[in-house]
Amino acid sequence: MGEIQTLNAKQNAGQPVIRLSGISKSFDGKEIIGNLNLDVNHGEFLTILGPSGCGKTTVLRMIAGFETADNGQITIDNQDVTNVPAEQRHVNTVFQSYALFPHMTVFDNVAFGLRMQKVPAAEIEPRVMDALKMVRLESMAQRKPHQLSGGQQQRIAIARAVVNKPKVLLLDESLSALDYKLRKQMQIELKQLQRQLGITFIFVTHDQEEALSMSDRIIVMRSGVIEQDGSPREIYEDPKNLFVARFIGEINVFEATAKERLDENRIRAEIEGVDSVVYFDQPVTEGQKLQVLLRPEDLRIEEIKESEEKGIVGHVTERTYKGMTLDSVIETESGMRVMVSEFFNEDDPDVDHSLGQKVAITWVESWEVVLSDEQEI
């Protein structure tokens, strides 16, 4: 077990384990990936996130060697593998279907790759059992796949991949077949296993929650292009454009007009007809259209009387109790629907708002993200 755990101990952390340089790929004359450049570091959990058809699985398949790039270069551990067949690359893939052999035992499934590589029999058994111990399934070595739960099958597929000592483990929508509770459990287990092994994981998903909860780093893709590359916190709290902001979780987008610059960090802007101060350090001109982005959990609402005017105001049109939070929809005077998420405190008489209640919407200064006006494509 120690041998696999220290797999990457001698790797050079100064060089990326995978580098994609100028990669492009087309199918039937349609460009899917265009001039993509990406470095993946040793030992990191990288998630490629994006909607269906954005090219994320194509990127994974080109790294694995299942697809050939039309242009560009792919290197793994500083070796050019652009035209190297899949079976000669030091990567393994865990697919959504797991692809376990139904007629083989768990042990034989995990040992299959080693036998294909003609690893000596005396070495196979300890390596297989070490891999099964990592996923806590050594007691099920003699069972068949149909005797296992979905989560157990997924862990066997991972054991079969890591027993080959890959430099990189590729996971293609590997949790999507599991139910919600099991998927949450496997998210934790996958991240723990990745830390234990020290192997680079590249995970492809369209599920934003999976990406945020497991990743060291997230790549957000759209139409074959990387829209943003950053940590989960950077992606969520500081989206670089409207597409990323709307793709990662819920967000409110207020239309705004710049009025004047107050200092190097702040400007005065009109939002929903109300003078407001927002943080924006980019060049701006009077009258310039902007978009002010705020997550539902960043907003606060205060109940006010119908006769009161207090900043941005609206009326509660929907409310949803979700246990830990109370989610409300506020319709402003302009007709905009604003989502607000508040932690539910049963001892607070003001947290459960009545439908039709007039409220004032506020937020902590600097929590907003301000973008130059753009229309989502």
Curated annotation (Swiss-Prot):
Q: How does it sit in the membrane?
A: Peripheral membrane protein
Could you give the subunit structure recorded for this chain? The complex is composed of two ATP-binding proteins (PotA), two transmembrane proteins (PotB and PotC) and a solute-binding protein (PotD).
The name this protein goes by in its record: Spermidine/putrescine import ATP-binding protein PotA
A GO term for molecular function: ATP hydrolysis activity
Class in the EC hierarchy, top level = translocase
User: Which part of the chain is the ABC transporter domain?
Assistant: 18-248
Superkingdom of this entry's organism?
A: Bacteria
Residues binding ATP, per UniProt = G50, P51, S52, G53, C54, G55, K56, T57
Per the UniProt record, the lineage of the source organism begins with:
Bacteria, Pseudomonadati, Pseudomonadota, Gammaproteobacteria, Vibrionales
Please give an example of a GO cellular component term from this record: ATP-binding cassette (ABC) transporter complex
Q: Which SUPFAM superfamilies match?
A: MOP-like, P-loop containing nucleoside triphosphate hydrolases
Q: What function is annotated for this protein?
A: Part of the ABC transporter complex PotABCD involved in spermidine/putrescine import. Responsible for energy coupling to the transport system.
